Each structure stands twice: as C-alpha cells, then as structure tokens.
C-alpha cells in the first residue's frame, strides 16, 4: 500500500464520530447502528389502547376519545344511525385525562361563538361610531360593564372594522357599476 493511502486509511480510522449537526445525524441516518445496541424506548401515549393485533405482532388501536363531551362522527352516524362516543376514563387516570384533554383542544375545534345581546351590541356600536380603534383601557371598561371578556370585545371591534371595510368596498363597486351602466345606455 502506498504511503498516501496508508495515511488516508489512518485518518479514516482516527476520524471522530459525526457531529450532531451533520446531515446524517439530522436525518437520523447515523442511528442505524445505534438502534440495534440501544434499548427500546417506549413513549407515553395514553390515547393508544392495545387491543387489536398489528402487522408486526404488536397490539395498536387508536380510539376516538372524548373526556367529557361526546365526539360525533358524522359519516359514521349517517351509516350507523347513532352517535359514537368513547370515554377516556376507561383507559387513563385523572392526571393523564386532564393532560390529554388539553392536548386535544385543537381537535374539538374553535371556542363556541359569543352570543351578544341586543343591548351589548347597541353599546358596542355607539362606542364604534365614536372610536373604531378603542384602546385596552376602553375595552377593559366595556368588558366590565357588559360582562364580557376583553378579548371578545377586541374581536368584536376587529370584525366590525372588517364589516365596515367590506361595505365601503361594495358601495364603491356599486357606484362604479352604476356609472358604467349609465354610460353604456347613453
């Protein structure tokens, strides 16, 4: 073997392990040799029940779960004619249930719409006529008077400004449309 090749092979032998910033490490390609020697890590997944055999002999089943409220599966309900619900109490303790409930809040969807009363809307509209961009102090004062959360009042003003902008745009469009149609008729 030539001296250059010997030197190169010694460098390869003395090479340090790849850094954690290498492409192989980031992609997980360097883990292939480590997987066989490392113990199997079992992740905490309280939403998984082990009651149906998978391809590799493990038992996995991911149920539809609801902590307190029933989950309605509309496609199944049409075919089965009933609501489908599974309770989390059957598979988890109280602490796991609360953690899971917080993690699944995205699944349940948005918060319910705030139903404003007629008097609340009148007061909000009066304030909007005077100031369409109320500060935090005015919003908090309104929240106290109207028994609403400040963030709901902030959203109401955002929606009201969007509605005003939309109606202004539509009125501009109608004015242009009317002027064009009158010119065409002449």
Swiss-Prot record:
Family designation: Belongs to the ANF homeobox family.
CDD domains: homeodomain
Classification of source organism: Eukaryota, Metazoa, Chordata, Craniata, Vertebrata
DNA-binding region: 109-168
Cellular compartments annotated: Nucleus
Gene giving rise to this polypeptide: hesx1
Protein name from the UniProt record: Homeobox expressed in ES cells 1
Keyword check for Membrane: no
Subunit structure as annotated in this protein's UniProt entry: Interacts (via N-terminus) with zyx.
Function: Regulates the earliest stages of development of the anterior neural plate. Plays a role in forebrain development by inhibiting the expression of otx2 and pax6 in the rostral region of the anterior neural plate. Necessary for both neural differentiation and neural patterning. Controls Spemann organizer development. May act as a transcriptional repressor.
Main location: nucleus
GO CC term, one of those recorded: nucleus
A GO BP annotation: forebrain development
UniProt keyword terms in alphabetical order: Developmental protein, DNA-binding, Homeobox, Nucleus
Organism: Xenopus tropicalis (Western clawed frog)
Keyword Zinc-finger: no
GO molecular function, one term: DNA binding
InterPro entries: HD, Hesx1, Homeobox_CS, Homeodomain-like_sf
Domain of life of the organism encoding this protein: Eukaryota
């Amino acid at each position: 073997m030539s001296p250059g090749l010997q030197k190169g092979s010694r460098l390869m032998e003395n090479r340090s392990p790849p850094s954690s910033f290498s492409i192989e490490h980031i992609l997980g390609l360097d883990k292939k040799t480590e997987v066989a020697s490392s113990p199997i890590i079992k992740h905490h997944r309280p939403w998984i029940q082990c009651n149906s055999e998978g391809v590799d002999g493990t038992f996995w089943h991911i149920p539809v779960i609801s902590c307190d409220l029933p989950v309605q599966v509309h496609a199944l309900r049409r075919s089965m004619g009933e609501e489908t619900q599974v309770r989390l109490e059957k598979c988890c303790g109280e602490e796991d249930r609360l953690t899971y409930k917080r993690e699944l809040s995205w699944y349940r969807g948005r918060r319910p719409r705030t139903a404003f009363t007629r008097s609340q809307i009148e007061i909000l509209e009066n304030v909007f006529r005077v100031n369409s961009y109320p500060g935090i102090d005015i919003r908090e004062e309104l929240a106290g008077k109207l028994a609403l959360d400040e963030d709901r009042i902030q959203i109401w003003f955002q929606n009201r400004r969007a509605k005003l902008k939309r109606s202004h745009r539509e009125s501009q469009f109608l004015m242009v449309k009317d002027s064009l149609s009158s010119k065409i008729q002449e």
